[in-house]
């Protein structure tokens, strides 16, 4: 884990924006289960959870790719994607939970007088029901889904939209996510970004090379990067 730079507590951060899957919520168990149900429909054996977990932050594209070796544009991908999404929607929050200490982290962010919100590439049809089933997340000051703006991350539009909704200048927002596109979106939006190193990172990824200000190994470590109370 990278340590906060000297003077980090004096940074004029007024809002924290979070990715959802792999940052606030551990949704990989339900995403992997949905993918394996698609495989089961086709007479294929389930893939190990450890194989699928690193793909969970990449949505249907990543999971269907991992499960069937196809990509958007390939024959069969649209049907596999739609079947996967139907299975996922039918069992959206069976095993999904908040990561450890996320509820306490959000409460402390609020106690420090900071706004917070969620910016995810997950479509609203999945985002909104999931947040309702993970109550602390329903307090978010803004929720921007993958289809809220014309562009999804790594485009900066979703983050800029969230900043506008919170009434906070982009440079005074901090973005936290577990995928390279999250960090790219934050930088493009003019926001400092932090890697959620406890999320769904693949062993072949090199987050230390991403243009983030730091990496945290657990949610509570984010507090060291934020202004103190008062």
Which ranges hold each PLM region?
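Generic enzyme active-site microenvironment
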Residues: 17-19, 119, 176
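A generic structural signal for short
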Residues: 23-24, 93-94, 116, 147-148, ...
């Amino acid at each position: 884990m990278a340590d906060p730079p000297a003077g980090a507590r004096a940074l004029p951060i007024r809002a924290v924006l979070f990715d959802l899957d792999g940052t606030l919520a551990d949704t990989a168990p339900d995403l992997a289960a949905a993918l394996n149900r698609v495989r089961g429909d086709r007479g294929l054996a389930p893939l190990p959870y450890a194989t699928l977990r690193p793909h969970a932050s990449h949505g249907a594209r990543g999971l269907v790719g991992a499960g069937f070796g196809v990509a958007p544009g390939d024959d069969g991908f649209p049907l596999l994607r739609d079947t996967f999404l139907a299975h996922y929607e039918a069992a959206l929050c069976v095993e999904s939970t908040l990561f450890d200490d996320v509820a306490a982290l959000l409460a402390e962010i609020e106690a420090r007088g900071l706004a917070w919100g969620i910016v995810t590439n997950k479509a609203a049809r999945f985002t909104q029901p999931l947040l309702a089933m993970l109550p602390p997340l329903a307090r978010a000051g803004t929720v921007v889904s993958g289809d809220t703006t014309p562009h999804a991350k790594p485009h900066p539009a979703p983050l800029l939209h969230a900043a506008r909704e919170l009434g906070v200048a982009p440079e005074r927002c901090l973005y936290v996510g577990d995928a390279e596109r999250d960090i790219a979106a934050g930088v493009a939006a003019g926001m400092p970004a932090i890697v959620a190193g406890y999320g769904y990172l693949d062993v072949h990824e090199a987050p230390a090379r991403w243009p983030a200000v730091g990496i945290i190994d657990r949610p509570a470590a984010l507090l060291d990067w934020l202004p103190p109370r008062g």
